[in-house]
């Protein structure tokens, strides 16, 4: 029996989990807590407080999924003034083995720990063992990556595919591209500027400014407040969530049009990734947005745009596509990584 510590470390929230592992029973969660990251100057006091409350021995191994790049076993969180160093963490926490992993890579590792109820199949396809697995996930940004089978395990390879160019396919998407280029006074638009939480807001602003439909007063006020708070780290409103809810409830035509365009672009980019990887092991849709707008994804052309790749369409129709419903998939991945240390 080995005691492990897994963590999902974000700019807003830090979730820690103690896990026991054994050869016969796999992983078993024994304690979990969530903390507001900004309340602490560093990860160390959070872990120390967590272990005192858990009242267990010091874990033998730990893996922390970090919202930011990992460089030479160090990490600077994207939205938090923390600098994490593996060697320092090991010394100050007394944990012999600590590993830092990118949060989207942790999602990749977590896929193997998901249960049937954690997934919603969008397309059954024709799964093929030993073939790549693809991951794409719109949230704050747009994560992309893939998994390759190595022995009895999978190796995860994150990428920066979300920063590839946005490729418009029809007149309205060309108009959107021109709008974003002019608005930001830049030479190129990454697909992340369209397929992400901020992308939802950008699409709404485009449709609003081009008079595609009238604004409803409540959504208009939320978006205006967000625009006025530009540059502030802490926002008082979440317009992406408000637009998504209004579209789901069919109470705001502009929000419905926004989500329609967003989902079409999301499906098209997922199809682009699938063409590059041919992930017959499955393409997994991660991130916080997809589960919240699942009815819209099912009915608003995601799969149509995913497979709409000319003569390559038959290939894409055979790729299994799943939406990950479990919001703790990254934490599961961190625990599985710790077990492999």
From Swiss-Prot:
Reactions listed under catalytic activity: D-glucose + ATP = D-glucose 6-phosphate + ADP + H(+)
Endpoints of the signal sequence: none
GO biological process, one term: glycolytic process
Enzyme class: transferase
Binding, ATP: 7-12
Protein's UniProt keywords contain Transferase: yes
Subcellular location: Cytoplasm
Keywords attached to this entry: ATP-binding, Cytoplasm, Glycolysis, Kinase, Nucleotide-binding, Transferase
InterPro entries in UniProt: ATPase_NBD (IPR043129), Glucokinase (IPR003836)
One Pfam family linked to the record: Glucokinase
EC number, UniProt record: 2.7.1.2
Alphabetized GO MF terms: ATP binding; D-glucose binding; glucokinase activity
CDD domains listed in its UniProt record: ASKHA_NBD_GLK
GO cellular component terms, A-Z: cytoplasm
Family that this chain belongs to: Belongs to the bacterial glucokinase family.
Record-given protein name: Glucokinase
Provenance organism: Nostoc punctiforme (strain ATCC 29133 / PCC 73102)
The encoding gene: glk
């Amino acid at each position: 029996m080995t005691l492990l510590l897994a963590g999902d470390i974000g700019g807003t929230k830090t979730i820690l989990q103690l896990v026991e592992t054994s050869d016969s029973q796999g992983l078993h969660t024994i304690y979990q807590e969530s903390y507001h990251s900004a309340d602490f100057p560093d990860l160390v006091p959070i872990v120390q407080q967590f272990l005192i409350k858990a009242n267990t021995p010091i874990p033998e191994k730990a893996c922390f999924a970090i919202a930011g790049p990992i460089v030479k076993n160090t990490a600077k969180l994207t939205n938090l003034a923390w600098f994490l160093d593996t060697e320092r963490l090991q010394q100050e926490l007394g944990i012999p083995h600590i590993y830092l992993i990118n949060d989207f890579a942790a999602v990749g590792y977590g896929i193997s720990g998901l249960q049937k109820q954690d997934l919603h199949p969008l397309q059954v396809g024709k799964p093929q063992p030993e073939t790549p697995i693809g991951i794409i996930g719109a949230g704050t940004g747009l994560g992309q990556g893939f998994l390759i089978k190595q022995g009895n395990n999978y190796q995860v390879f994150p990428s920066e595919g979300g920063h590839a160019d946005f490729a418009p396919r029809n007149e309205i998407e060309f108009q959107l591209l021109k709008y974003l280029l002019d608005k930001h006074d830049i030479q190129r638009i990454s697909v992340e500027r369209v397929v992400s939480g901020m992308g939802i807001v950008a699409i709404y602003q485009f449709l609003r400014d081009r008079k595609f439909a009238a604004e409803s007063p409540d959504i208009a006020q939320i978006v205006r407040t967000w625009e006025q708070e530009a540059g502030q780290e802490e926002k008082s409103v979440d317009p992406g969530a408000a637009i998504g809810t209004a579209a789901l409830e069919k109470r705001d035509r502009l929000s419905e049009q926004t989500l329609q365009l967003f989902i079409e672009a999301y499906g098209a980019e997922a199809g682009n990734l699938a063409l590059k990887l041919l992930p017959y092991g499955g393409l997994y849709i991660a991130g916080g947005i997809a589960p919240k707008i699942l009815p819209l994804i099912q009915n608003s052309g995601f799969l149509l745009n995913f497979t709409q790749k000319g003569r390559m369409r038959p290939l894409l129709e055979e790729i299994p596509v799943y939406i990950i419903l479990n919001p703790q998939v990254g934490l599961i991945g961190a625990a599985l990584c710790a077990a492999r240390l």
